[in-house]
Structure formats: structure tokens, C-alpha cells
């Protein structure tokens, strides 16, 4: 199997007067599984289509395996794309759907049979080869679409929201199958999604995009644990990170975040790293906020969401702000209860009025 790096060097794209990608640079290493994650309209699918050759590049260069390809047609780039819609030929068997692209480029019958046999084994669809798409479930059709890419032996796989049409249970199963497929093939893979769970569980690195630019590139736990911006902190994680307006008190060189009611959250963020002036917000994830009798932060429970192994508590603080705390196991807390909260300040982040994040030293 071919495995190639992909390099984007100051790539730009315009639709009329609207710039949708602006001088974006990124290196995807050979064998990496990269997720492009972001909301609708952020440019992630456009960027994928530029790599595939389905959209032109208005500036910069794209290189695959060290070779510049942005001037080449899609078929000459050595990539295989799997779309949200399966795009299978309904009148053909699964075998013929898998073979179609290979026949068009003159691949021998023996080689076609060998590749299809191998792809069918990996994807566990050998028993489906004589069926037509109408006889398959949604998950089976998606595996056939992936198989059609697999038999091409490409330099890289490009997935454009391939799980969006599947129901929740099937989406989980197919996600596991994709992870297993990458472990077996170690193929360079780009996966476009708006679903943070797909990105977090599948990718070795995530490219978080917003408003046609890259907000952050990092491993899933870097993105989750040390978000570069407020957008990333809000977009990744469920429930979203809590944000509360604060003033800062110096605590031996570290920042204590003072809330509106005078209570404090002692962070490990260095005071000298913070900007002078401007508004600041403390950001804390729900799992770092606990109901405890000795907690420093008082509040009233408004909504209780019981999720089985954990409970999310929506709490209004005495200064009027709200947050979500997580209670492990079967919580005894009820709506209307007054509680006290303890916050793990070591995991807290601070954000300035431009949305930039400040973290504890590593």
C-alpha cells in the first residue's frame, strides 16, 4: 500500500469576492489520521475538495508525497474519496461496484479480483459481493463505499462526513470499523466531520476550523485539555466548557479568579502571562466542578440531567451566572436544591476578550 504525506502551503480559495480559505498551511504526515473538525460553513469540506482536485486552488501549493498536485486533475492525484452519500451504482453487484474504477483504468482481471478479495476481507463484506446495493443495510453500503476507495490503493484516503447518514448505533459501529481499518492499513487519512466524538475517537491529530481559518491543530487530548481559543473550548467537549467573568488576584505568582460574588477559583495560570487590562473569563469543564459540603462556590440547582453513570447539574450562582457541574454516579441532588461547589482550579483556564487562552505551565 502506498502511504504519502500531504502538504498545504499557503493555500487560498475564493468564491467570487468571498475568501473561504486564507493562506492555510498544514503538513499531514505519512500514515496519519487527521480530522478536519468545525461547524457548517467553516471551510473544512472545501479544503478537502481542494486536496482531492474537485475545487481549484486560487493561491499556494498542494503536495502529495512531495509532488506538487494542485495543477493535476483528480484522477492523477492518487487519492480516493468517500462521500457522505454512498454513490453506489444500484444496477451493479457489490463486486462490480468495487471493480468499476479499476476496470476504467485498465487493471487486469486477476489484479481486480485480488484487490477486491483483500478489501472484502478487511471490511468483512465477502458474503455481500453478489448482492446489489438495494439489498444492503446503510452500514453495509457505507462499507462498500469505503471498499471502493480501498481497492484503488491510493496515497491517501479522503472522507467527507461519511457517517452523517447513519443512525446513532450504526454510527458508533462504523466509527469502530474505521479505527480498526486505519490500524490495519496505516494509510494517510483525512476525515471531515462536525462531530467532535468522531474527531476525538478516530484522529491522531485534529484540525479545528472556524470562520474559514484554523483555530488549533493538536492531538485530541491537547485540543480538549489545552484549547488555544475560547471557540475551541466551547466547540470541543460535551457539555461545553463553563465560562464565568472574573477579576484576577495575584496568589504568589499564580492567578486567583475572583467571581462576582467574591468567591474565588485558584488557578495555576501564571499572573505574568496574562494581558494587562481587558476582560477575562475563567473556563472550567463540568467534570472539574463537584458538589461538596465544604465547597467555596454557592449556587441553586435549576435543572438535573441524569445520564446513568453521571449527572449534569445546571446551577445558577449567587452572582446570576450559570454553569454545569458533573456529579458522578446516581446523584441525590434535586432541582431547587442549594448546593456548594468545589472547583479543581488546577484544570482551569483563563481567556481574554479576544478569546485567546492562558493555561497552567506544563
Language-model segment annotations:
Residues 60-68:
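Conserved ABC transporter NBD signature motif
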Residues 33, 74-231:
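ABC ATPase nucleotide-binding domains
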Residues 239-244, 250-362:
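Non-catalytic connector elements of ABC transporters
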Residues 7, 27, 63, 340-342:
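ABC ATPase nucleotide-binding domain
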Residues 52:
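Helix-to-loop junction immediately C-terminal to a conserved catalytic motif
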Residues 24-35:
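Pre-Walker A (P-loop) beta-loop-beta motif of ABC nucleotide-binding domains
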Residues 37-39:
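The feature captures the beta-strand-to-loop junction immediately N-terminal to the Walker
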Amino acid at each position: 500500500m502506498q502511504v504519502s504525506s500531504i502538504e498545504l502551503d499557503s493555500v487560498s480559495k475564493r468564491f467570487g469576492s468571498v475568501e473561504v480559505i486564507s493562506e492555510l498551511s498544514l503538513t499531514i504526515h505519512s500514515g496519519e489520521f487527521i480530522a478536519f473538525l468545525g461547524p457548517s460553513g467553516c471551510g473544512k469540506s472545501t479544503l478537502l475538495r481542494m486536496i482531492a482536485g474537485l475545487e481549484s486552488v486560487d493561491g499556494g501549493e498542494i503536495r502529495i508525497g512531495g509532488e506538487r498536485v494542485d495543477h493535476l486533475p483528480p484522477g492523477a492525484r492518487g487519492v480516493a474519496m468517500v462521500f457522505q452519500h454512498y454513490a453506489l451504482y444500484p444496477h451493479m453487484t457489490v463486486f462490480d461496484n468495487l471493480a468499476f474504477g479499476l476496470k476504467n483504468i485498465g487493471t487486469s482481471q486477476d489484479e481486480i479480483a485480488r484487490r477486491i478479495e483483500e478489501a472484502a476481507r478487511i471490511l468483512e463484506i465477502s458474503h455481500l459481493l453478489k448482492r446489489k446495493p438495494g439489498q444492503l443495510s446503510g452500514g453495509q453500503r457505507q462499507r462498500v463505499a469505503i471498499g471502493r476507495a480501498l481497492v484503488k490503493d491510493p496515497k491517501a484516503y479522503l472522507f467527507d462526513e461519511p457517517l452523517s447518514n447513519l443512525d446513532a448505533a450504526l454510527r458508533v459501529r462504523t466509527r469502530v470499523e474505521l479505527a480498526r481499518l486505519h490500524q490495519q492499513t496505516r494509510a494517510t487519512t483525512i476525515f471531515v466531520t462536525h462531530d467532535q466524538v468522531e474527531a476525538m475517537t478516530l484522529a491522531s491529530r485534529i484540525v479545528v476550523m472556524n470562520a474559514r481559518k484554523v483555530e488549533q491543530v493538536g492531538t485530541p487530548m491537547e485540543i480538549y485539555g489545552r484549547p488555544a481559543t475560547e471557540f475551541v473550548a466551547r466547540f470541543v467537549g460535551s457539555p461545553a466548557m463553563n465560562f464565568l467573568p472574573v477579576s484576577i488576584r495575584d496568589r504568589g505568582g499564580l492567578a486567583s479568579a475572583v467571581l462576582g460574588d467574591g468567591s474565588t477559583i485558584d488557578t495555576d495560570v501564571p499572573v505574568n502571562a496574562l494581558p494587562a487590562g481587558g476582560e477575562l473569563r475563567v473556563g472550567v469543564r463540568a467534570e472539574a466542578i463537584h458538589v461538596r459540603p465544604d465547597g467555596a462556590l454557592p449556587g441553586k440547582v435549576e435543572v438535573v440531567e441524569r445520564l446513568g453513570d453521571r449527572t449534569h447539574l445546571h446551577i445558577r450562582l449567587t452572582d446570576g451566572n450559570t454553569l454545569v457541574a458533573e456529579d458522578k454516579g446516581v446523584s441525590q441532588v434535586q432541582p431547587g436544591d442549594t448546593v456548594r461547589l468545589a472547583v479543581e482550579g488546577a484544570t482551569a483556564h483563563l481567556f481574554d476578550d479576544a478569546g485567546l487562552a492562558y493555561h497552567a505551565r506544563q
